[in-house]
Amino acid sequence: MCYYRYVQVHSIWRRFCALGLLVPFLLLLFSCTNTVGYGVLQWSLPDLGLSTGDILPVYVRSNVSQVYIVEIQKKKVELPFWQLKLCRTKKEALQYAERLREYRYSYATSVLDGLPLREGPENTAPQVYRLREGQAVKLLWKGTGKAVYRGENRLEGDWFKVMTEDGTTGWCFSHGLSLFDERESRPTVRETDDLARDRDLQHVLNSAWYPEYYRTMVEQRRIDLEKMASGWGLFVGEKKGLARIELPDAHYAFPYSRLVKTGSNGYLFDGSSLSIYVRDAHTLAAQFTDEAGRLRIERFVTLEKTPEEIIAEEQLRRSALLEHVCTPGLRLHSEIYGTLSFTERNVFTWTGARALSPALIPAGAGSTGRVALRCFIDQSLKSEYEGVLSFDFDSAQEWVHFLYLRTPGGLKLEHIDSTHLKDATVLRRSVSPVVLYFAPEGHAEPQP
């Protein structure tokens, strides 16, 4: 009975996660219980009337989304981990807020390109980050550090613990910073009259910007065709005054009146919550507030080839490999698992597979369908298998996946549960795998 109840609860939990209902469920759960702690704001949110040092009750910590869910003006709002310091008790939160009090409204911009942030308050400490000229940082507190010299001359300034707009922290010597109070002034802003001569902006306007994970897929040579399309990315829309961010699971539109440059690498879409920060020639970060009041940061990149070209090459690669593995006319047989044959257009027929249903192949799935190469295997599995064959049975609603290895005597398949897949990659084998051996029809079945 206890095991049955565990299975029921585990099944319900997995369904909440799969349906994207985990955060709403946690909100409902924690709305009736105590908070998980108190968050001290480390970077002001002027749009919400909040400043550094403000304390907010934290209801949920989501390690998956890397956000805290807090209450602001009687609304639940998501804030990224870096923007809050989570404390277990109100007393701890008050102590941390007191530490931030002296420089609560103090920010700074770098007057040098490449100004380093260091692990400690001394010029010989390891570097953790380099600031671009004009990049803004938050001053957290002043520290006692070693003097800094240029030749024999001691430079004026202090060591500050600072934070960048993406949460990176380090120690920075103030000689290379221009400090300002957020209540009185902002970093120098250049109006749009100068933007026509701005090389960074012209590069932004003349380039196509795609989700950062596109580049990761290209570098790893793991192109997930379901997560790549030319219509996803950042679209500045300069002529229409309408910027758009299109993602697989979300759409955002930002009507704006003009582009305003902030510092050396930041641009504000005036009239909207959208700002972009150019990291390098191929990367930028977009920061905005979504319809739920959550601060979001999305990164976008340029590519050497268009998504259409990348998709076409991947489709060609898969087609050639699949034809080599599942050659039309090939018939494979197993005494236990039936006969598997392939014909043109990646069509398969699998008869006599009753031993696999319903545990692996859904009941009523039928015996025909299409086979495809849709997934990849983790590097740790490449010594044992070549790849993944995915079977789409005509009367089933879910794909059935098998690791495969071509052998001199036929084909070896190993069933993979969909829970072992992440980002279209098989991460691990099952604890007790079901392994199938097939031989060409008329030949002896290969042995394990």
Swiss-Prot record:
UniProt keyword annotations, A-Z: Membrane, Transmembrane, Transmembrane helix
Keyword Iron-sulfur: no
Disulfide bonds: none
UniProt xrefs under Pfam families: SH3_3
Mode of membrane association: Single-pass membrane protein
Subcellular location: Membrane
Transmembrane segments annotated in the record for this chain: 19-41
CC per GO annotation: membrane
Domain SH3b: residue ranges: 105-181
Keyword DNA-binding on entry: no
Name of the protein: Uncharacterized protein TP_0260
Species this protein is from: Treponema pallidum (strain Nichols)
